[in-house]
Regions:
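Gly/Ser/Thr-rich loops at beta-strand to alpha-helix junctions
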Residues: 51-56, 102-110, 145-149
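Glycine-rich oxoanion-binding loops at beta->alpha junctions
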Residues: 54, 61-93
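N-terminal amphipathic/basic leader segments beginning at the initiator methionine
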Residues: 1-46
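Gly-rich Lys/Arg/Thr-decorated short loops/hinges at beta-loop-alpha junctions or inter-strand turns
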Residues: 42-49, 58-71, 136, 207-223
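Conserved small/polar residues in nucleotide/adenosyl-binding loops
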Residues: 236-239
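Short, acidic/small-residue loops that bind anionic groups at enzyme active sites
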Residues: 70-75, 119-142
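Internal, active-site/partner-interface "lid" segment
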Residues: 136-143, 153-214
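Short Gly/Thr/Asp-enriched flexible loops that form oxyanion-binding sites at enzyme active sites
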Residues: 108-121
Length: 239
């Protein structure tokens, strides 16, 4: 595969810089990520984040009607607590701050540390964990967050934009997350910038059912079916 990259180590930061350059009226760069270029004071702020490589998430989700800021880690790696703190401080609008992310150990640790630091400064900061991946655990609240991030964060952001208070927004997040389920199938692994081999491989004619977005093991491999058969697998697998 042919790729156009500079130094692979700089890929995430250059991707963010390019996005900001393309949309300077909407995005402002800060340490660790981006925030909205225009401020709306006295509203609950929503900051989303996670590892880079899931484009357009997470920086591409910042703007009117969506997130107030995004924390962008290295490729498939959790942002640091200091990055999360810096973006959250820049995004805070004085009415409480919500930090939304998929349920992954590194994100839980680092975003949690940032929230603790913000609370010590008098900011009502709370973490929102998306848990939609039915392949990852039997208990809904222990599952990973995958494609469900998008609808869950969008509805949550709309509640923030309406001027709901932080308790109302959290209640809406809980309802939407509780009603969101995802299941993925993989046909091939991606090749990360600077790597020579794919992150994982799936045998020709097979599909990996339930594989995670970073190549985490799924439920099983099975024969690749037709579009209708794959759709039925995704829609009717029990959670």
């Amino acid at each position: 595969m042919t790729r156009l990259v500079n130094n692979p180590d700089n890929f995430p930061s250059q991707a963010v810089a390019g996005l900001v350059s393309a949309f300077p009226n909407h995005l402002r760069p800060v340490f660790g990520g981006v925030v909205r270029a225009a401020r709306t004071d006295r509203k609950v702020a929503l900051v989303v984040g996670g590892g880079s490589g899931h484009y357009p998430a997470f920086a591409g989700w910042v703007g009117p009607g969506f997130a107030d800021g995004a924390v962008c880690g290295n490729i498939f790696s959790s942002p640091s607590a200091s990055q999360a703190y810096a973006v959250c401080k820049a995004a805070d609008r004085g009415a409480g701050l919500l930090i939304g992310f998929g349920n992954y150990a590194g994100d839980v640790l680092h975003f949690g540390q940032a929230a603790e630091r913000l609370r010590s400064e008098g900011i009502d900061a709370r973490c929102l964990l998306v848990t939609d991946d039915i392949a990852s655990a039997p208990d809904h609240l222990k599952r990973r967050g995958i494609a469900g991030d998008l609808p869950v964060f969008k509805v949550t952001a709309a509640a923030c934009e309406e001027g709901r208070d932080i308790d109302e927004v959290v209640a809406i997040f809980d309802r939407v997350n509780d009603r969101t389920r995802s299941l993925g199938v993989a046909f091939a692994g991606c090749t990360l910038p600077g790597a020579d081999e794919p992150l994982f491989r799936v045998e020709a004619g097979q599909m990996g059912v339930g594989m995670g977005i970073h190549g985490e093991p799924g439920i099983h491999d099975e024969t690749l079916g037709t579009a209708d058969e794959v759709a039925a697998c995704l829609l009717y697998t029990s959670d």
